[in-house]
A protein has these predicted regions:
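Positively charged n-region of N-terminal signal peptides that target proteins for export
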Residues: 1-9, 247, 398-400
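Short, charge-rich amphipathic segments
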Residues: 18, 107-118, 168-170, 269-273, ...
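Solvent-exposed, charged interface segments at domain starts and junctions
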Residues: 18, 141-144, 183-187, 324, ...
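Charged, low-complexity, helix/coiled-coil-prone segments
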Residues: 24-34, 84-86, 117-127, 153-154, ...
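Internal transmembrane alpha-helical bundles of multi-pass membrane proteins
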Residues: 223-418
Length: 418
C-alpha cells in the first residue's frame, strides 16, 4: 500500500513543497539583503579548521568559520588564537547565488577573540579533541561524530581508502546508532514491560524516543545534509511502517528529497546531499530489480544479496564520486569489508569516548589511515557526468541498464589505475 492513493494527492503534496520552497527562498533573499546593507560586517563565528598554504611571496592560512546562518572561508596571514571569534568581513562582492549555497568566501580585515559561552557542539568537540594527541586523529573523530570539516591531507587519506562516506555522517551512521541502541534498550526494558506494561508496543515507543533523540543530534550537527536526508527518510519510513504502508520505494525517496529541499533550499547545492540521495537510490534500484521476499527466509541468500548490493553500490557510485574527487586507488575496493568492520568500530569507539579513553587505538588508526597511497586519477567531463545520471534514472525501467551502471563504474575505476 502506498502513501498517496492517486496522482492528485501527490500533485497537491508537490504544490505544497513548492510553496514552502519558494517562501524559504524568499526568506533567504531577505537575509542576504540584510547581510549586505553595509559593505562590511562583523560576524560571530566558530573557527572550524585552518589550512596552511604557500603563496607567491609568503605563507597564509585558509580559515573556515561557521556562523549561525552559514559557513564561510577567508584568508589570514596568521592563525587566530580563538575558537569563537568575531570576524570583520567585506560583503560588497558577495552574490546571492553564492550566499544561497551556505558556503562562500569573504575577504576579512579583522579577527578577534569572542568571549562567549561555548555551544554544546563546541563542548563536545573539545571533549573529543582532548582524548587524542595526534591532530589528524582529533580531526577524524570530530568529523566522525560531529560532521566537522577535514583538512585537505586527511580528506585525501580517507579518499585513498574510499571511506569518505563512512567518515561523513549519513544514513549509515544513523542506522548503526539506531540498531545498536534499539536492541540494547529492547533487551533492557523487555523484562519490565512483561511485568508492568505488557499492553504497550515496545518497539514503537523505543523507535519514537530514538527518533526524537536523533532529531536532537541532527540539531547539534546543524542539519548536516546527508544526515538530514537519512533522518527524513527514517521518520517517513517509521510513519509508513507503523501504518502498514510500503517503505522501500522510489516514491518515499522522492518524498524525503522534496521535504528536505522545501525546508532547506541550500541542499540544492550540497554535494553530500546528492551523494546521499544517489546512494539510497542505487540501494532501492537493486531491491527493485533483484529483491524477492522469499529470499528473506534464507540467511545464505540474505548474505549473498548484501554482498552483491555492496559491490553494485560501490561500482555504481564511482563515476559520480570521481567527477568531484578524481583520486583513485586499488585500496578503495576495501571499503566493502571495511563497511562491516565499521558496524562494530563505530559504537565501540563512541563507547570509549564516553569513558574518556577514545585515543586507545590511535597508534593503529594513524598507521592505517596513512597507509593507502593515491595510485591513479579519473578525469571525467561534465557531459559524461550528466549522461551517467540520466542513464541512472533510466535504470528503473530495465535491469540491463542497471547492470550497465556497474560496468561503467568498473571500467572507469580500472582505467584510472592502469
Amino acid at each position: 500500500m502506498n502513501l498517496f492513493s492517486n496522482f492528485r494527492q501527490f500533485g497537491v503534496f508537490i504544490a505544497i513543497c513548492i510553496a514552502i520552497f519558494t517562501l524559504n527562498l524568499y526568506l533567504e533573499f531577505r537575509s542576504y539583503e540584510a547581510f549586505k546593507t553595509k559593505p562590511y560586517n562583523f560576524i560571530k563565528a566558530d573557527l572550524l579548521f585552518s589550512d596552511k598554504r604557500q603563496g607567491k611571496n609568503s605563507k597564509y592560512y585558509v580559515l573556515q568559520f561557521k556562523s549561525d546562518n552559514f559557513i564561510f572561508y577567508t584568508r589570514s596571514k596568521s592563525l587566530p588564537k580563538c575558537s569563537s571569534c568575531e570576524v570583520g568581513v567585506i560583503t560588497k562582492n558577495l552574490k546571492f547565488k553564492d550566499y544561497i549555497t551556505g558556503r562562500f568566501f569573504l575577504p576579512s580585515f579583522k579577527i578577534s577573540k569572542l568571549d562567549i559561552n561555548d555551544s554544546l557542539a563546541n563542548i563536545l568537540k573539545n571533549t573529543i579533541i582532548s582524548q587524542h594527541q595526534n591532530p589528524k586523529m582529533q580531526e577524524l573523530y570530530s568529523a566522525l561524530y560531529l560532521a566537522t570539516p577535514m583538512s585537505k591531507e586527511l580528506r585525501q587519506n580517507v579518499t585513498h581508502w574510499g571511506i569518505a562516506h563512512i567518515i561523513a555522517i549519513s544514513g549509515f551512521h544513523l542506522s548503526v546508532i539506531f540498531i545498536f541502541v534499539f536492541f540494547v534498550a529492547r533487551f533492557t526494558i523487555a523484562p519490565l514491560q512483561d511485568r508492568y506494561f505488557p499492553y504497550l508496543n515496545l518497539r514503537f515507543y523505543i523507535s519514537l524516543i530514538l527518533f526524537i533523540l536523533m532529531g536532537f543530534y541532527l540539531y547539534i550537527l546543524d542539519f548536516t545534509p546527508s544526515f538530514l536526508r537519512s533522518y527524513i527518510m527514517g521518520v517517513v519510513g517509521f510513519l509508513l511502517l507503523s501504518r502498514g504502508l510500503k517503505v522501500f520505494s522510489f516514491g518515499n525517496l522522492i518524498l524525503a528529497i522534496l521535504i528536505g529541499l522545501a525546508f532547506s533550499p541550500q541542499l540544492l547545492f550540497s554535494i553530500g546531499f546528492y551523494f546521499s540521495c544517489l546512494g539510497v537510490y542505487f540501494i532501492f534500484l537493486y531491491i527493485y530489480h533483484f529483491g524477492n521476499r522469499s529470499d528473506l527466509s534464507s540467511l545464505k541468500r540474505i548474505l549473498m544479496h548484501t554482498l552483491i548490493l555492496e559491490i553494485f553500490v560501490f561500482l555504481a557510485m564511482n563515476i559520480p564520486v570521481y567527477y568531484f574527487f578524481p583520486i583513485a586507488s586499488w585500496y578503495q575496493i576495501s571499503v566493502i569489508p571495511l563497511s562491516y568492520v565499521f558496524i562494530i568500530f563505530y559504537p565501540v569507539s563512541l563507547f570509549l569516548h564516553l569513558f574518556g579513553i577514545g585515543g586507545l587505538f590511535d597508534d593503529f588508526m594513524i598507521r592505517f589511515i596513512e597507509f593507502a597511497p593515491a595510485q591513479g586519477k579519473a578525469n571525467l567531463e561534465l557531459w559524461q557526468f550528466i549522461g551517467y545520471n540520466i542513464i541512472a534514472l533510466l535504470a528503473i525501467y530495465k535491469k540491463w541498464i542497471m547492470l550497465l551502471l556497474a560496468l561503467l563504474g568498473l571500467f572507469v575505476y580500472i582505467f584510472a589505475l592502469i
